[in-house]
C-alpha cells in the first residue's frame, strides 16, 4: 500500500469464492492490531457458515466479528477509539452499505470491506461494484479454477453436482458443497446465452 497522510479511506478486497478474501481481510485486521490500532470487524447475520460471531476463512483463520442485520446498525458499535472498520461478505448487506462506508471513511476511519464482485451468474453482485468505484484501493483476488487449473475469477454454483440455472435465487449461503471457483471458460450457467 501507499503512504497515506490523511486519515480515512476505503479498501475493497474482492474476487470469487475461495480466492482468499476473508483471509486477506483477517490478515489486514491482524496487522492493525500489531500496530496497536483498534479495529472492529462486522459481518452480515446471514453469514453463519462456520460461526455466528467470527469471520472465518475457508482455511480456518478467524477473527471476532459483530453480526449485524442492517448496514446502519454498524454505527451503533463504532467508538471514537476505533481506527479500522472491517466488513466481510459486504455483498450481502443492503443498499445503505455504500453510504455507511462513505460516512465512516469521511469521519477518518480506515474502512476495509471484502466480498464477491460477481454472483454465481458472473454478473456484478450487490453494492460491491459501487464500493469498488469509490474506494482508494481495490484488491481483486483470484482462485484456481477447479475444472482446468487456470486463474478463476468466477464462482460456479452447483446443485447436485450440476451448474445452477441462471434464474435460480441469487443468494444461497454455502461453501465447497455448493460452490467452486471457475475461470471464464469453465464457468457455466444454463439458459444464459452469453456464457
Curated annotation (Swiss-Prot):
Binding residues for Zn(2+): 145, 148, 183, 186
Keywords carried by this UniProt record: ATP-binding, Cytoplasm, DNA synthesis, Kinase, Metal-binding, Nucleotide-binding, Transferase, Zinc
* Chief subcellular location: cytoplasm
Q: Which BP terms does GO give this entry?
A: DNA biosynthetic process; thymidine metabolic process
What is annotated as the active site?
Answer: 89 (proton acceptor)
What catalytic activity is recorded?
A: thymidine + ATP = dTMP + ADP + H(+)
Q: Which positions bind ATP?
A: 15-22, 88-91
For this protein, the Enzyme Commission number is: 2.7.1.21
Return the GO cellular component terms, semicolon-separated.
cytosol
Top-level EC class: transferase
Q: Enumerate the subcellular locations listed in this protein's record, separating them with semicolons.
A: Cytoplasm
Tell me which domain of life the UniProt entry assigns to the organism this sequence originates from: Bacteria
Pfam families named in the record: TK
Q: Which GO terms describe its molecular function?
A: ATP binding; metal ion binding; thymidine kinase activity
Q: Which HAMAP family match?
A: Thymidine_kinase
Subunit and interaction comment: Homotetramer.
Of which family is this protein a member?
Belongs to the thymidine kinase family.
The name this protein carries in UniProt is Thymidine kinase
Q: Which organism is it from?
A: Bacillus cereus (strain ATCC 10987 / NRS 248)
Q: Show the taxonomic lineage.
A: Bacteria, Bacillati, Bacillota, Bacilli, Bacillales
